[in-house]
């Protein structure tokens, strides 16, 4: 097996680790703007700041996963306070919906929509609530990850998705929490990176003793048992092309990625593993490989952990990581802004992995608050000179429609809930999370769904107290009705042409209630099907 040039790896790790000292005095948002502007100046870009209405909708969706109400939008847009953006950010970060939204984002990073082996429903709601509680308390990120990878209680669902497969667990843990892709070295040494099969199986060795057992209900039940044995190793047979039928391979001891092997105590003579199928709870081992990996992972000097977190949070709010893709932190994949990435990582560690602080600094920056405008030729994503445009997730889309039409006003018993469960179709067509990818492509199926969805039709039907009902019953002028419609749905005032056209549309010839209800419903339907509503910009 070829051995990669380890000095390159060592210098790479030392360079990063050496930067983790102290915190700077000036706000990080200022450093962000200075470093990003260097790129703008070099590329001769002149980005413009987003309008208040665009910023308002963007920050609500990014921090809460919802849009502002009509009353909130009207009041904030009329506010003349020069610090209103900063004050709004602080208010939204303290809103309980932010914790739920951020927990949902992290949950999707860890599991996606459809995790393997049917674990999408197992304790998923319990885990999201647990995670939301941690976010609400601003629990340090390293502590959250410690609890997740301890594998006890609600966080145990993370390991459950891999059902005791050490190799799959290694791939998932390194991708999510270290931002690295190690799966290529599962079958052969990486052709371009200094990553070998020994590295891969060394990491997998930390998870070789995880035990997963289905509980009541079998694979389709909600209960399962998760624990760790005192014995067991992964087996390595060499490269796939050299493997022979029936060959079991050699046991591989745990080894930290690009680091040393784990020093383990010797088990007592005559030690015998208990029959795990008969015990009520899987006993904890006297020495846990998994715990040793977690201790190493979250250390401040670990060059992967903090960088992966910073890069993913930056991508969440800026549309693209400083290293792109977000889960490919490697020696050959350089960041677009190396100095900024180093400073942000150093500050994140110095602030004891304070996620809320980091989010606040990112969204308060001028770089975050740019408009999605400018010449297409200047729209290179790594410059961050234009705001990213991303589709709403299914949760955001439903929350936005519900808020726009004031659905809860007519359905007080369903406050905060969807009009029925999110259907399989809605999840299929609208639900994939966005983490900096640029490959969104609307489909005919999505278009047909938005045109014919029973869920959406139910939400926009005019009822007393809803937007549709107010447009039907209100004695306000046509201009006032159109302003309410646009502020409610698009978080902005209508343009002159829109005001004229929608004013005529909302006052149909004949003027009977049925005609007004149809006009009201259709006007709302038109706006929620615009690209302006479907996307965050």
Features from the language model and the residues they span:
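Adenylate-forming
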Residues: 432-434
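Bacterial N-terminal signal peptides
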Residues: 10-19
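Primarily short, surface-exposed interaction patches in extracytoplasmic proteins
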Residues: 26-53, 57, 67-97, 111-409, ...
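Boundary at the C-terminal end of the N-terminal hydrophobic targeting segment
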Residues: 21-25
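N-terminal secretory signal peptides that target proteins for export/translocation
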Residues: 1-6
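Catalytic and ligand-binding motifs that coordinate phosphates/metal ions
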Residues: 403-429
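Conserved AdoMet
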Residues: 101-104
């Amino acid at each position: 097996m070829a051995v990669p040039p380890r000095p390159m790896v060592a210098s790479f790790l030392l360079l990063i680790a050496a930067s983790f000292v102290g915190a700077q005095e000036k706000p990080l948002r200022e450093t962000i703007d200075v470093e990003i502007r260097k790129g703008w100046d070099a590329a001769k870009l002149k980005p413009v700041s987003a309008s208040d209405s665009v910023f308002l909708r963007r920050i609500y969706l990014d921090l809460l996963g919802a849009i502002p109400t009509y009353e909130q939008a009207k009041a904030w847009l009329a506010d003349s306070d020069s610090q209103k953006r900063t004050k709004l950010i602080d208010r939204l970060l303290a809103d309980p919906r932010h914790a739920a939204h951020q927990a949902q984002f992290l949950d999707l990073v860890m599991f996606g929509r459809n995790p393997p082996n049917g674990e999408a429903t197992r304790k998923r709601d319990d885990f999201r609530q647990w995670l939301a509680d941690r976010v609400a308390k601003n629990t340090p990120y390293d502590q959250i990850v410690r609890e997740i990878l301890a594998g006890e209680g609600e966080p145990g669902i993370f390991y459950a998705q891999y059902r005791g497969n050490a190799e799959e667990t290694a791939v998932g843990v390194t991708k999510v929490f270290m931002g690295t892709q190690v799966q290529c070295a599962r079958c052969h040494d990486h052709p371009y990176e200094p990553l070998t099969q020994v590295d891969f199986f060394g990491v997998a060795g930390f998870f070789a003793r995880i035990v997963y057992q289905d509980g009541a209900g079998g694979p389709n039940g909600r209960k399962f048992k998760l624990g760790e044995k005192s014995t067991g190793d992964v087996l390595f047979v060499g490269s796939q092309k050299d493997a022979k039928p029936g060959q079991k391979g050699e046991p591989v001891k745990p080894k930290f990625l690009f680091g040393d092997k784990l020093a383990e105590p010797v088990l007592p003579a005559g030690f015998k593993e208990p029959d795990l199928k008969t015990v009520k709870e899987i006993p904890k081992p006297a020495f846990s490989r998994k715990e040793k990996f977690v201790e190493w992972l979250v250390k401040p000097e670990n060059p992967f952990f903090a960088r992966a977190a910073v890069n993913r949070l930056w991508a969440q709010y800026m549309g693209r990581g400083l290293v792109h893709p977000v889960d490919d932190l490697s020696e050959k994949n350089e960041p677009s802004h190396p100095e900024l990435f180093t400073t942000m990582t150093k500050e994140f560690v110095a602030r004891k992995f304070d996620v809320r602080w980091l989010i606040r600094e990112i969204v308060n920056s001028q770089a975050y608050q740019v408009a999605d405008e400018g010449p297409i030729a200047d729209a290179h994503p790594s410059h961050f000179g234009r705001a990213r445009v991303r589709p709403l997730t299914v949760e955001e889309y439903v929350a936005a429609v519900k808020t726009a039409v004031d659905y809860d006003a007519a359905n007080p018993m369903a406050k905060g809930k969807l009009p029925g469960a999110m259907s399989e179709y809605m999840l299929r067509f609208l639900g994939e999370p966005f983490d900096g990818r640029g490959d969104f492509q609307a489909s005919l199926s999505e278009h047909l769904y938005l045109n014919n969805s029973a869920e959406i039709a139910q939400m926009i039907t005019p009822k007393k107290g809803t937007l549709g009902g107010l447009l039907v019953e209100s004695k306000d002028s046509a201009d006032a009705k159109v302003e309410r419609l646009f502020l409610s749905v698009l978080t902005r005032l209508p343009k002159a042409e829109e005001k004229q056209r929608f004013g005529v549309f909302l006052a149909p010839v004949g003027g009977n209630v049925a005609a007004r209800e149809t006009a009201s419903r259709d006007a709302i339907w038109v706006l929620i099907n615009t690209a302006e509503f479907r996307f965050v910009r």
